[in-house]
Each structure stands twice: as C-alpha cells, then as structure tokens.
From Swiss-Prot:
<dbReference type="InterPro" id="IPR004424">
    <property type="entry name" value="IspE"/>
</dbReference>
<keyword id="KW-0808">Transferase</keyword>
<feature type="active site">
    <location>
        <position position="18"/>
    </location>
</feature>
<dbReference type="InterPro" id="IPR013750">
    <property type="entry name" value="GHMP_kinase_C_dom"/>
</dbReference>
<protein>
    <recommendedName>
        <fullName>4-diphosphocytidyl-2-C-methyl-D-erythritol kinase</fullName>
        <ecNumber>2.7.1.148</ecNumber>
    </recommendedName>
</protein>
<dbReference type="Pfam" id="PF00288">
    <property type="entry name" value="GHMP_kinases_N"/>
</dbReference>
<keyword id="KW-0547">Nucleotide-binding</keyword>
<dbReference type="GO" id="GO:0016114">
    <property type="term" value="P:terpenoid biosynthetic process"/>
</dbReference>
<dbReference type="InterPro" id="IPR020568">
    <property type="entry name" value="Ribosomal_Su5_D2-typ_SF"/>
</dbReference>
<keyword id="KW-0418">Kinase</keyword>
<dbReference type="InterPro" id="IPR006204">
    <property type="entry name" value="GHMP_kinase_N_dom"/>
</dbReference>
<dbReference type="InterPro" id="IPR036554">
    <property type="entry name" value="GHMP_kinase_C_sf"/>
</dbReference>
<dbReference type="GO" id="GO:0050515">
    <property type="term" value="F:4-(cytidine 5'-diphospho)-2-C-methyl-D-erythritol kinase activity"/>
</dbReference>
<comment type="similarity">
    <text>Belongs to the GHMP kinase family. IspE subfamily.</text>
</comment>
<keyword id="KW-0414">Isoprene biosynthesis</keyword>
<dbReference type="Pfam" id="PF08544">
    <property type="entry name" value="GHMP_kinases_C"/>
</dbReference>
<dbReference type="GO" id="GO:0019288">
    <property type="term" value="P:isopentenyl diphosphate biosynthetic process, methylerythritol 4-phosphate pathway"/>
</dbReference>
Length: 305
C-alpha cells in the first residue's frame, strides 16, 4: 500500500490486489470454513484508493464509494473499523471515500486489501495500538486474506489463508515473466463458489496422490521446451476450476484463449472470475490488450520482478 496526500488530518492510500498462483482446498472445518494451500502473489495493478479524512462530527465511520452497487452498511471496511475500535476503544471520527479500481467478485482480494489498509491506518493512529500477534488475529477475524495484505509479500498460505510463510519471488522461477489478467464483467461470490465446490465433491475432501507438503520443490518447469505450459505442472492448479467452469463456461474459453496466445500457464485466480496468463515476453500482452479492449473486457498486465 502507498500513502500519498498525507497531512495531519487526511491521507490517500493506494491498495493493490493479489492472484493465487495455485489454490488447493484441503479440508473443511467444523464451522464450515475451508482449509486451503495456496501461493498468494501481491500485485500493484489493478488498485483501489482510500481517501481517509479525520472529521469533527463524532460520527464514527462515514463511508462512501464511486461504485453505487457496493454495499456500504455491511462493507468489510465497516467491519474493520468496528472490530478495531472494539478491541482498542480508539474511536476516531473519520470519513472514507473508496475509489474502486479493483473489480469485485473477481478473486483478486480487493476488499481484503482495503481492509488491511484501514487496519494499518487505525493501528498507526491509535494511542494504544495492538501487539503484532493481536493485530494478525484481528485481521484474520476480519477476513481470511487480510493478514496476507498486511505482509503484502509473496506467501504460501495455509489454514483458512491466515497462516503465512513468505516466499522469495526468485524461488518461484517466474521473475521476468509478465502476468496478464482478464477481468470479465462477472461477479462470483466466494461463499457461493465454496458451496458449489462442496456440492461437486459431495462433502468429500479433494485429495491428490501427487500433492504433498514439499510444494516448494516443485516451483519450476522445463524452460528448454518452448511449448511447455506451467499449468501442466503440479503447483499451478486451482481446485475451483472444475466447478466454476461448469457454471460459467465463458471462463474456460478465456483460459483457452490465453493458452492460444502463448501463455506458459493460464489459471483462475481464487474463486474467480478473473483469469490470468503467465507470459515469457512482455510484448506478447499488447496484442491481447487490444483484442479484449474491443470486447469491452478489462485487462491488466504486470511485469514480475
């Protein structure tokens, strides 16, 4: 997250997003939450902006947004403010204007990223900040991906996503590649996606005899073969794809298109709806940008360094 327009009473925070380089669903907890094993990769684009201003209206939190159909009463920012003030008794009167640039319902973690930004701001401004361990615990209570955005570094996430192990980008063997993200005009609710997965698997946990905890040994592919797709390899998979693609067939078409354009891998991010491709050369993405622009489909690209 990046701070700008910083003053004693206001600031603007730019928040990035994430993609899942893989996503395995490894169990279901008694409370219905799902255990995962996933690689989270933070990205600077697309991004949101939070303009936070301290007011004198004794109103608690006032939230507004440039997207009209985003729910404000039940928003994750409201939840963040409520839980932090309850834990610390720090109740600043603030107004937040949220400028959405990250498509929501796209599996990019925009809401969790915004929550982490607000949580960081509250922590920095609180006269009685939480200890690091309590802050992480509160972040996980807000949302499973929020602890990751507090770190904002490549991580292997386990548990419900709150147990994080930092990973060097160089160890993933993807430095120098370009990530190209397609964000179709389609919103997929994460709870609905998990329900579809549960129904598809008849409450049985998906397992693979090829999958084990030594995942870090498998962050590579045969660079000598130009036709090799990363998606042929164990680690770049997403357990949501069979169920999501059966319901939203257009997403499987996007994946196939990315592979036809020369992607070394094409994978659904999170529970969707965004699909990304990994390309060896940055200039490969310019043709795709124009191709999808003509179809009024949002795309983003980022060189991984």
């Amino acid at each position: 997250m990046i701070y700008s327009h910083l003053s004693s009473t206001s600031c603007t925070i730019t928040t990035g997003c994430k993609v899942n380089l893989n996503l395995y669903i490894t169990g279901i907890l008694p409370n219905g939450w799902h255990k995962i094993d996933s690689i989270f990769l933070p990205l600077s684009e697309p991004h949101d902006e939070l303009h936070i201003e301290i007011t004198n209206h004794n109103q608690g939190l006032h939230l507004s947004c440039n997207i009209l159909d985003i729910e404000l009463e039940n928003n994750i920012l409201t939840k963040t403010y409520t839980l932090f003030t309850k834990a610390t008794h720090f109740t600043p009167s603030i107004s937040i204007y949220l400028k959405k640039g990250i498509p929501y319902g796209a599996g990019l973690g925009g809401g969790s990223s915004d929550a982490a930004a607000l949580l960081t701001w509250l922590q920095k401004n609180s006269p009685l900040p939480l200890s690091p361990s309590k802050l992480l615990k509160l972040a996980a209570e807000i949302g499973a991906d929020v602890p990751f955005f507090l770190k904002n570094k490549p991580c292997r996430a386990t548990g419900i996503g709150e147990k994080l192990e930092e990973i060097s980008l160089s160890n993933l063997n993807i430095s120098g590649n370009t990530l190209f993200i397609i964000c179709p005009n389609l919103k997929i609710s994460t709870p609905y996606a998990y329900k579809m997965w549960d129904d598809y698997n008849k409450k049985q946990i998906a397992t693979s005899s090829r999958y084990n905890n030594n995942l870090t040994k498998k962050y590579s592919w045969d660079r000598s073969s130009p036709s090799t797709h990363l998606s042929d390899y164990l680690w770049m998979k997403n357990d949501f794809e069979p169920v999501i693609f059966s319901e939203y067939t257009e997403l499987s078409v996007f994946k196939e298109q990315l592979l036809q354009f020369g992607a070394r891998a094409a994978v659904l991010s999170g529970s969707g709806s965004s699909i990304y491709g990994l390309f060896k050369e940055y200039n490969q993405t310019s043709i795709m940008t124009e191709f999808y622009k003509k179809k009024n489909i949002l795309t983003f690209s980022q060189l991984l360094q």
